[in-house]
Structures are given as structure tokens and as C-alpha cells.
Amino acid sequence: MGREKELRRTKCFWFGYKGHLAVGTSSQYILQALFSSGSLNDGKATIPLLKGIQERLHLPLRYQTMDAGYDYEPIYEQVHRMGQQSVIAYNKRNEGEIIGYDKHFAPTCFREHSYRYDSFDPKYETLKYTRPKECSDCPLANEGICQKVYKVKITSDLRRYTAPARGSQAWKNIFKRRTAVERVNAYLKEFFQLNNVRYRTGKRAKIHFDMVTLIYNASKLAADRINVQLNQQQVA
């Protein structure tokens, strides 16, 4: 909800508002919503959304999934304090290559083959990596210089290490669920008039935004209950 205008041909400014949503990827319900000026960075709105979920909703959430625009250390720390795991795309930010590790921060062997993510120990918050499959026929395998298992505590660097580990198939599968947020955004804009806010004052625009999110959740709840009843009738 923003608009750009030219000022003296060279300068531009933004006015308007922005809605920030925390969406359940499985249910597609809006769990938490925040209304702000159009200039607020999405990353700065994330921690209030996370705290709102923790304080008001008692849900057995395991992961917080976000794109690279939310790759900030404070967000990882907040998710960790909530007892959950961050599945956030990594924004490299001109960082140099780390010797001894691949692009997903998994350790590599002498021949630069990546160790494979094996498991996560929640008690010690430790990721376990095992030997690469290439070690089976490597001449260095029996020389005693290659480590069979690597263990890394996720708290050593919350940005780089999470459970499941970056680059693993499990991590990729969880990250794909983030598309649910885009679907909800599309629903709100196309069917609930969120893309057609005509108010210039923040108070009225916020009421419009709150009503849209409330009506969406109510409609979703009604549709889900009807589906449950229909399924029960079919079984009976």
C-alpha cells in the first residue's frame, strides 16, 4: 500500500502503509499481523510478529521459514529463544569463501567433498555430519587423516547452522512451504480488497487492514468447518 510521486523531477518520496503477516504454512491462517508505514523494512517488523505469536498463541510450532530478506542475526536469536528453528535463505552480503566448508557451511574433506548432514541432537543442539560418499574409494580414507564424523553446535553461529542443516533435502522441503505466504498475500489482494485501500490517514487504513485479515481468517475457518462436515458425511 504505497505510491511513488515525483518531486521537482529528480526527487522521489513514498507515502502509504504496509501490512506484515505471519502465516501458518499448513493451515494458511494469519497467525499475526502488523500494520506500519510503507518505509519500514520487513526485517524490522519480524521480531514483533514473532513475539506476538509467542505471547498470544500457544501453538506447537517447530520452524520459522523466511526468504533472504529476513536474514538478520537478531531474527535468528529470537527464533532460538522461542525454542524453534530458523529456515531462512542465506544472504551472502559479499562475504568471502570459508576455507574448509562448502556454500552451505558443511565441512569438507581434503579433496573438498562435502560432509553429509546426518542428524540433529536437540539435547546438545548439535548437527552431525558424516563422511562424504566419495570417501568409499578415496586413497586417503585409510591414512587416518580424514575425520569420520563432524559435530557442530548451532549456537556457534545461528545464521549458518540450523536444524535441519542448510543444503539438506529436509531443509529444502521445509523452505518450499514458504510459498503459502505468497498465496495468502495473493488471496488478500485479489479477493479481499487489500490492494484497493483508498484511505490516506493511517487510522482508517489500519481499520481496513484489520478488517481484511479478520474476515479472511473467519472465511477460512468457516470453509474448513464445512469441509470437515462434508468429509464426515461421506464417511458415514
Give the ranges of each region predicted by the language model:
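Alpha-helix capping/termination and helix-coil
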Residues: Q54-L57, Y72, G83, N142, ...
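Acidic/polar loop patches that form or flank catalytic/metal-binding clefts of enzymes
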Residues: L61, V87-I88, A223
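Short, solvent-exposed polar/charged micro-motifs at secondary-structure junctions
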Residues: P74, E97-I98, H208-D210
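Basic, amphipathic alpha-helical segments enriched in Lys/Arg and hydrophobic/aromatic residues
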Residues: Q169-A236
